[in-house]
Amino acid sequence: MLGASGTTERSGEVYLPYVGHVSDHIVLLEDGSIMTMAHVSGMAFELEDAEMRNARCRAFNTLLRNIADDHVSIYAHLVRHDDVPPSPARHFRSAFSASLSEAFEERVLSGKLLRNDHFLTLIVSPRAALGKVRRRFTKRYRQKENDLTAQTRNLEDLWHLVAGALEAYGLRRLGIREKQDVLFTEVGEALRLIMTGRFTPVPVVSGSLGASIYTDRVICGKRGLEIRTPKDSYVGSIYSFREYPATTRPGMLNVLLSLDFPLVLTQSFSFLTRSQAHSKLSLKSSQMLSSGDKAVTQISKLSEAEDALASNEFVLGAHHVSLCIYANDLNNLADRGARARTRLADAGAVVVQEGIGMEAAYWSQLPGNYKWRTRPGAITSRNFAGLVSFENFPEGSGSGHWGNAIARFRTNGGTPFDYIPHEHDVGMTAIFGPIGRGKTTLMTFILAMLEQSMVDRAGAVVLFDKDRGSELLVRATGGTYLALRRGAPSGLAPLRGLENTAASHDFLREWIVALIESDGRGGISPEENRRLVRGIHRQLSFDPHMRSIAGLREFLLHGPAEGAGARLQRWCRGNALGWAFDGELDEVKLDPSITGFDMTHLLEYEEVCAAAAAYLLHRIGAMVDGRRFVMSCDEFRAYLLNPKFAAVVDKFLLTVRKNNGMLILATQQPEHVLESQLGASLVAQCMTKIFYPSPTADRSAYIDGLKCTEKEFQAIREDMAVGSRKFLLKRESGSVVCEFDLREMREYVAVLSGRANTVRFADQLRKVQGDNPSAWLSEFMARYHEAKD
């Protein structure tokens, strides 16, 4: 930047009109203007219906009409940059989960995330020019102190009006922050981020705020600009609108939110007086008429605009827009510029790259630099509301009901989404997706990441598996796993597995009665009930290895076939169902951390399945005492097919929900679940729903049953292409599409989602090397591809 002589370099401070803070949230400019800035989180838009977005646009236009004043200007900035806050330190119980988290961060996320930051700036100019601020601390300026006070009061009133109207957008007013006894100006940091596309702390100084911001050298040329820092340099280029789109719509510039490189989008809007606005419209109309312009429609629209302006349907303002993109070298810059230009052209604008005006265009990005604005144009507040929508991709939450976010995913915009398992304090989650889409892998990944919430709280995870799909995760994290068998001793022997307690007595009485009555031949007599109670008492007084259903049966009468003893006979060892609950050993060992049960072979055996569920849930119930607890169920539709099992599960889940518990369910098609009364009830209670792409998705099931919006249904059925490795997360607080692409982590996928051949291969390794994960897991992950079908 050359000075007036043309031979010396002009100081960047010339372009930085910021004197300093007059309060924590207000900054004084050299021309006497004052400004305040806010960071805007932004509203989710990707899956919003058009009606909602149009309503927000109308509300924003109404706000602009309410604050319209020719001494007020608004700046809106979008800064897309790679300064993404790191994930919090993660602590796990098992080495596998820690390794999984680290690999996911490094292979899937590292270097692939960008952040979108919106900023809103309000500037109030003085009613009368006060002269240069450096001459302001004089007697003349002291006479104007009352004007500054009124100006500040006006700005505060504006801020409160704007903050109230845009509360849902997540506004946070920037001010002064303290870190390690040093004060930093957030306004200065935001201005520097707008200037450079990089975040750098800016301390509060006693001198000029502008001077404290300009610490890197900016060199502007016709082909672009260069920013030189002490450690590196990078280049940029700026694009502006030569002609505006014929029409505007909400979020029309959101195409920039997902570009894979840093950029700064700047827009300013300075309100015009009503007379100035009418003059501009009248002048344009007169020019077209006097030149014989045949664009009758445009002339008519100008007349309509004058009527709308007179009716206060909108206000007019001087608008300026520029897009600055950055790259490490000129070759990359040219490629990025072409892509950005195409995106803007797709929005309907005629875009031009700045050349001679590069220097002015660069400095015009900063709030208050009106004189450097290139190609300003008059637009309506409705147009401005469409161009500046303050929409963004959801960023999730850094903390929730159980502490820090347990995982970070990548959104469609390449931005981070921090995942917490709860919506408010409700941890009910349902995962839907056709077979082979990856829902089991995602479910087990979440279970592994949940170790962070459990490790210091004595929390526990219990999962009901299908076809041993989650067995390897359970074993890799040091848990216990039991695959229940059919036709051979199942592994369940309640009389041998329960301790001699009052709770065990009560449970066994109800459970044995249910076994007897499962034949559908009615209840048992009071006498038989008394004999049963005595028998249970006697059995539990024995050592566990001496207990059996066959021994209990001896306490019941050897009477007719309709008697309780005869009806219990089939459940005794050596009889038709003796294998189910009267084996030599009860293999239910609840791990204090994670336990898995595979009931695949019992699901179609109604009588056995319901009784097995009752026993398992009784054992598990001891862990549901207020500590953190997670119950997971893969392919849970299969469990709903058994009414007795479903009834047992429903009763148990009520206990889970009341005692700080979580539930994660996974199944293929929602319509199968919604057909069940319990299934529909469970899904309704799931505040978090996760959907995988489904080209055959049933409209009624998704929209009527699962309450998806039209845009969400469209994403599930069409937009999320099969094989894209994306899922849609739906919550009341907003929906988002995230990537879960583990193609660079195939050895971990082999553990998260077991197949018949990989499970057998792991069995072989464990038989030779032992069950401790440290003995077999690393070899399995290195050789899993050797597994034979």
From Swiss-Prot:
- Top-rank taxon: Bacteria
One GO term in the molecular function aspect is: ATP binding
Is Repressor among this UniProt entry's keywords? no
Q: Which residues form the signal peptide?
A: 1-38
Binding residues for ATP: 433-440
Q: Does the keyword Signal apply?
A: yes
**GO cellular component annotations, sorted alphabetically?**
type IV secretion system complex
One family from Pfam that matches here is: CagE_TrbE_VirB
Q: Which residues cross the membrane?
A: none
Give GO terms for biological process.
protein secretion by the type IV secretion system
Q: Which keywords accompany this UniProt record? A: ATP-binding, Crown gall tumor, Nucleotide-binding, Plasmid, Signal
Q: What does this protein do?
A: A possible function of virB4 might be to provide the energy, via hydrolysis of ATP, for translocation of virulence proteins of the transfer of a T-DNA-protein complex across the agrobacterium membrane.
Give the matching PANTHER family.
TYPE IV SECRETION SYSTEM PROTEIN CAGE (PTHR30121:SF12), UNCHARACTERIZED PROTEIN YJGR-RELATED (PTHR30121)
Q: Which family does it belong to?
A: Belongs to the TrbE/VirB4 family.
Q: What is this protein called?
A: Protein virB4
Gene, per the UniProt record: virB4
